[in-house]
Amino acid sequence: MRRLAAELDTGAASLYVYFKDTDSLYSAVLDELLGSLSLVRGRKPWRERLVSLLTAYVDLLTAYPPLAKTALFTRPSGPSSVGLWEAMLALLSEGAIVGRDAAWAGDLLLQRATATAAEEGERRLGTNTVAADEQVTEVIEGLSPKRYPHLASLSNEMMSGTPTTRLIWSFEVFLNGITATRNKP
């Protein structure tokens, strides 16, 4: 709060008139940022629109790593957050995912999206991310096939794919599981 107050050329106490703590400030900023999301409408299939919405959410948060981390630990409840949830639930409803299944599916999908954004955001801030990736690749490729037969046989696949490709694949996996288990106790 002090750092922001200094940038705004005001005292930290003046910010507390509007926000009870840093978390509430970040939550408000996050909600404002979410307002810039385009809530996907159109004629494309519901799954495609849902994956597009979630991917746009990840892209938005990834551009602001501190807010992505904030989104992991806060439950924003501002109008833009509520609008995001409403859009998600409407899309799930189009896929006949309703009630508890929709509520839990939305939570699961947003958890995945938010965690991915926080991780990717941190990677973008990091100075040695390429070196770290190379180190992990080197370790995996150097594994003994006798001791680690599964990892060794999949060494090329373990680090394959772009972050976006892997993210979309994960959403599809979740949606396949969600649709397969809907309406079950």
Predicted segment positions?
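Hydrophobic alpha-helical connector segments
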Residues: 38-83, 102, 106-109
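Short, Lys/Arg-enriched C-terminal cap helix and immediately downstream tail that follows
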Residues: 26-28
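Short amphipathic alpha-helical interaction/hinge segments
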Residues: 37, 65, 69, 117-124, ...
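C-terminal peripheral helix-coil segments that are non-catalytic and often amphipathic
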Residues: 94, 122-185
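Short, basic, alpha-helical segments at the C-terminal edge of helix-turn-helix-like DNA-binding modules
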Residues: 32-36
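Residues in soluble alpha-helical coiled-coils and helical-bundle/repeat scaffolds
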Residues: 20-24, 62, 76, 97-100
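Helix-turn-helix
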Residues: 1-24
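A contiguous pocket-lining binding segment that forms or flanks enzyme active sites
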Residues: 86-125, 130-138
